[in-house]
Structure formats: structure tokens, C-alpha cells
Amino acid sequence: ERGLALPKLLGDMLGVCGFSLMLGLGRTGYGIFGDRISIHKVMTFGSLGACAMYILAAVSGNPFVGMLACGLTGLCVSMLWPGSIVVASRALPLAGASMFALLSAGGDLGASAGSFFTGLVTDAVEAMGLSSFLGQAGTAEQVALRSGLLFAAVFPLCCLFVNLILKRMAERQDT
């Protein structure tokens, strides 16, 4: 909301609620139609979509477009975590509870590290006075937040590459 210069109430309602609604719709949709859709295709779409939405939210000068991108990010990421559990359980059907514990710990670590590094980039852009160098409109804080969001687009790309590797491994096992 600060990065897009929106009032707090409007930002909370549109951003958090929109993200949550789209997250729920994505998971519900996969629950209904998942038997007809490859989880790897869903995760590829989700990774590419999340990356695109992060970039759109970061570079959009229009607050409405930025908020729409934040909401649609919820749809894009909705199946990334559950999808990783589906892929792991199909690849290692006898792994048991320890696999899910490791996946949970890895997911928590990834969520924490992603937020941490995004915050580092945001703080560095603001502290080093790079906002005027970057030439974006807005306050130094807004430019720094947008820069951090732009940096965060790398994480869904990492998810995409891992998913493509796992898909290739699954195809080799099937042949």
C-alpha cells in the first residue's frame, strides 16, 4: 500500500483480502479440476504468473494495476506449496512423515529467506539513496519498496527451474 501510495484501509482490503481470495479460489479450482490438469503445468503457470505479477506490481505507476497484480499473485502462488507436496508424495510414495516434516521446514526457511533478502534489497536501495538513480516516480520509500518487489520476482523463477527439473525427473521415471 505504501509502495502504491494507497490509503491503509484500501490497501489492506484490496491487497490482503484480494490475495487471500485468489489463493483460495486457485486451491479450490485445483481441488475440483486437478485430476484433469498436470501439477507440473499448474506449477509452471503459477511460477511464471507470480514472476510477472511481481514485476507488474513493481513497475506499474497505476495503483489499481499494482493492487490487481498483488491480488492475482495469490492465484498464481496458490498451488506452489501444495503442488510441491503432491510432486514429492508421487515421487517418493513410501517416504512417510519425515519427508513432510522436511518439506515443511524447507518451506518455512524459504518463506523467511525470501522475505529477508527482499527486505535487504529494499533497505539497501533506500539507505544508499538509489531511488533518484533508479528514476522511478514516488518517494524514496516507494522506490525502495518497488525495487524490493522487483527483486522478489527471482524467487518464483527459482521455483520454475526446480519444477522443470522435477518434471524431467518424473518423465524419466515413467519411461
Predicted regions and their residues:
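A membrane-interface helix-boundary motif in multi-pass transporters
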Residues: 120-154
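Intracellular juxtamembrane helix-capping segments at the cytosolic ends
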Residues: 79-92
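A late C-terminal transmembrane helix in Major Facilitator Superfamily
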Residues: 94-130
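Structural signature of the two symmetry-related core transmembrane helices
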Residues: 41-56
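Loop-to-transmembrane helix entry
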Residues: 3-22, 98, 102, 144-150
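Helix-to-loop junctions at the C-terminal end of transmembrane segments
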Residues: 26-38, 122
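Multi-pass alpha-helical transporter architecture, strongest
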Residues: 150-175
